[in-house]
Amino acid sequence: ALLHLREFGLDTRHIIKGGDRLGTYYFESAASMRNSVVVYDRNNSSFYSLKHGDIDWKPIFDDAKIFHCSGITCAMSKDALDTTFDALELAEKMGVEITCDINYRKNLWHYPGADAKTTLHKLMEYSSFIFGDQNEWEVGSSLTHIPFEAMDSSYKIDDDAYIAYFKALQKQFPRCKRMLIALRNQIASSHHPLTGVLSSEGKLYKTKIYDINPVIDPMGCDDAFVAAFIHARMKWSDDDQRCLDFAIAGSAIKNTIIGDQSLANEDEIIEVMNQ
């Protein structure tokens, strides 16, 4: 696994090892009238076995600009949750920007005292940039999401509804400067119109709808979305529209790639973005 990360030039110096194995999941693809099914097997895995205090965050944050965290980590165990919030507190003190992916997975919150809604809301309160799909935002904020009912790329987003929705979210998360929502309508197992909306400093941004048909593999599409957005922000920080356009193009490409990782590079994403 470490060699795979290094293959893409990622710095693995601060990765620690633990547990008996890597976590796994089993995914049954949707087809026709049958929904997809995901089974997580994380017992005795590295994250599951993480103990509070195992990670020394100070040297990690010394040269960091952004700390990106996931709700999935908080779902693994009480120790993983406490470790996450230790990191958030130190990142804030050291001036490291905090971004988060809500990443709500209901099948993971099993440890005694686990409270997904309260924990995710607290995680979001630390963040200057928050990403999630419609349902995840509803879990984290308890605000009913706006239905996305696109049947093709001609669908029009209700600007006023999203402006009001983002204003309500901003009251709950006053530190957050950018809020990004992934919108997907699963018409059929292999037909998903996809887009995203962004609120940045109180301004609404929209982008094109990709009418993806056929979908090859939807796993990891939201990860590709947020990764592309963070990459774009680091490169074009003064152009929120370009960042959103790049992010949704990155997510759209992932729908055409088998597996849960997107291997698309910047040039390939820009090519799709400019179509």
Name each region found by the language model.
Residues 1-72, 269-275:
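Conserved N-terminal subdomain of the carbohydrate kinase-like
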Residues 12, 98-100, 131:
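Hydrophobic beta-strand scaffold residues
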Residues 43, 72, 103-107, 135, ...:
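Active-site beta-loop-alpha junctions enriched in small/polar residues
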Residues 54, 81-86, 112-121:
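Charged helix-capping and loop-helix junction motifs
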Residues 90-97, 173-177:
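A short helix->loop->beta-strand "cap" motif at the edges of active sites that frequently abuts
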Residues 94-99, 103, 108:
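Short beta-strand/loop segments at the ligand-binding rim of alpha/beta enzyme cores
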Residues 108-203:
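Conserved phosphate/ATP/ADP-binding segment of small-molecule kinases
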Residues 189, 204-275:
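Conserved post-catalytic alpha-helical subdomain immediately downstream of the catalytic base
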